Amino acid sequence: PVGIINADFLREVNLYTGAFPANRRDALSSVIEMYQVDGSKEQFNFRGAIGASDLALTADGPIGENTTYIASVRRSYLQFLFAALELPFLPKYNDYQFKVKTKLNEKNEISVVSLGAYDVNSLNLEANDTEEQRYILGNLPVNNQWSYAFGVVYKHYGENGFDTWVASRNYLDNKAYKYQDNNEVDSLLLLDYESDEIENKFRYEHTSRFDNGLKLNYGGNFEYAKFFTDNFNRTFFGGESVEFNYESSLELFKWGAFAQVSQELFKKRLVLSLGVRADANNYNEHMQNLLNQLSPRFSASFMLTQDWYLNFNTGRFYQLPAYTTLGFKNPEGVAVNKQNDLKYIRSDHFVAGLEVLPDDQSKFSIEGFYKKYDNYPFSLIDSISLASKGADFGIYGSEPVESIAEGRAYGAELLYRNRDLFGINLILSYTLVRSETKPLKESLMDLWWIPTTWDNRHLLN
């Protein structure tokens, strides 16, 4: 119900459902860019807010002549609301966020940004009157996790553009357990999961703009990641109990490069953009080759009138499977997914639509889309694509898989965005969508495409 980002920090939000910028990686369906506000240069400000689900405190102001800050903390009381509504799960969250920005001189600035959270999801065992409540209580594990992200951004402004250096570190500690019938006896243990994910990242990029309408962006990234898991999982397959009990650790070096060029033509009536990026890592031989993850993208926007635009974009995008899947080991301690030549998940996009800009603050658009997915991890335990398990309860992905599943999503979307509607940054959308996967069982091949668990048909956000 609530994201880790405090909305008070947001200056601008850009949602990309296609034509992802080449400097954004590891995304298949959409990208959200969020830009934070700076703290006040003139005075100290303090705000307290009591919402429907949490208490939030925010402060901002100057630190000396050239430095500003903004910081907030939030604590939820959502668990009391859920208990009153007799919901079977009780989420609690606590988070913090801050940004400190220093303008060194006219051409150089540095920002320090951090956010973190501690979340606990417990079960409300008294809410068990209905079949739906009992199903959730029987499947949802007790879960708690804490995380943080910390980064430093340095920018140098030149005559026609600027250079950006970004160094960051993020950490996620995740624990979950589940007992049969929620009876906490050792012999009834179904799940006891703990994992740690640590990522240390560096990115450089250069952006230039020229008087002839040309924009150029290029750069590269490097990342060192560590993953550890201690996992006990008892599941049932073919009427028999199957146990996985292992510890696993994984170290990954990731690297990538990107470039994108955009050009305005015909007195800015036509804007063309062509970009490419490539990513790789040292997990296995296939993933080490940048050319195996070559990701081109192209977009065009034509101005029909002053406020009406016709848009088109296409591209191929890649995403690394989850660490839980990359680091899985069988009871003999063998990294079977590495042996199975696990691959990056691939998605091909085709999107076209119409956009209306009534004023500088608002946008209305309608677009049709077709997105094809390949190399999705396919479970060798229950013959289900991991794409369908993401809508279910609990931990998933810690199992033997092969990169053989296919999927597709297609439909149309209506979107309205206003950056200042009575002081609110509003994004409202309705999506008519079909989400389907191709079954691999011979008995189902005559169906060809079947709905996934994400096949909601109608989405309102």
Describe each PLM feature range.
Residues 27, 64-80, 126-132, 163-190, 228-235, 251-285, 307-350, 370-399, ...:
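Surface-exposed extracellular loop regions of Gram-negative outer-membrane beta-barrel proteins
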Residues 1-15, 96-98:
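Short acidic/polar hinge/loop motifs at secondary-structure boundaries
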Residues 265, 370-372, 393-461:
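Gram-negative outer-membrane beta-barrel transporters
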Residues 43-45, 81-88, 133-140, 149-153, ...:
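Extracellular loop and loop/strand-boundary signature of outer-membrane beta-barrel proteins
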Residues 216-309, 320-321, 442:
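Signature of Gram-negative outer-membrane beta-barrel scaffolds
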Residues 17-19, 36, 50-54, 63, ...:
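Transmembrane beta-strands of outer-membrane beta-barrel pores
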Residues 109-158, 163, 171-198:
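Flexible loop and strand-edge segments within Gram-negative outer membrane beta-barrel domains
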